[in-house]
Amino acid sequence: MKTMNKLFLGLGFCAGLVSCSDFDEVNTNPTAAGEEYVKPQYALNNSIGQAQMNPGTAERVVVYNWASAARICGEMSFLNVGRYSDDYTSAYYYPDLSSSIKNATLAITAVENQLEAATTTAHEKEFFPNVKQFARIWRAYLISEFVDNFGPYPIESFLGENPVFNSEKDDYEFILKELKEAAAAINTSVLPVEAEGKCDPFDNVKYDPVKWQKYANSLRMRLAMRLSNIDKATAQTEFEDAAKGNKILTAD
């Protein structure tokens, strides 16, 4: 009898060891979407939407920080409530601008991780690298907004570790470098399918690679001009180099 009991205990122990391999599967929520299921263009869509479709904070920050201080806007010609309150500025810092940068970074890392894991379709294997460049361009713009409104920005932010804040000089060098590299890395022969194009909040762009390339070069020219009173040589070099590429010359 003791021998039989030991036999059953042994079999039960072995069965338990075998079933341990299923623990991770049991603890995985079948309805939760992990990063491997996140289309990078969705994250970029969210980033653009957060920054561009909430004028309640972004536009007011410009008015409060610049127009009101410079007396461009008369005291009675715009909404007076909260004019000298920092509530809107705080909301723009977090969650609006910070969340937008976080989602743009997510779009970049999602592309890198999914390409490495080889979970993409043949089309996505070509299209996703462009999405990464679009996200780099958009994030560069967002970082410029952060630096211009709040000062030093941590370049290594939203990567899972507590970042160190960089100087504004380093930030602008990073921004201009990102714009140059991203514009050059865009494959203008790879076009999005209809569903992917609809994911671009800019209705007249629709993840068109040429238009994003033009945006990158034009933005680089504009941001280079901001350095003209601080580092004229760099401003001129960056502007002239960006001007050699595709750029926005018409409203369409």
Regions found by a protein language model. Give the residues of each.
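Bacterial Sec-dependent N-terminal signal peptides
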Residues: 1-28
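Sparse, context-dependent recognition of short Cys/His-centered cofactor- or disulfide-binding micro-motifs
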Residues: 5, 32, 120
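Alpha-helical transmembrane segments and their juxtamembrane interfaces
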Residues: 15-16, 56, 232
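Membrane-proximal, proline-rich intrinsically disordered regions
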Residues: 20-77, 83, 87
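Structured, solvent-exposed acidic/aromatic patches
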Residues: 37-38, 73-252
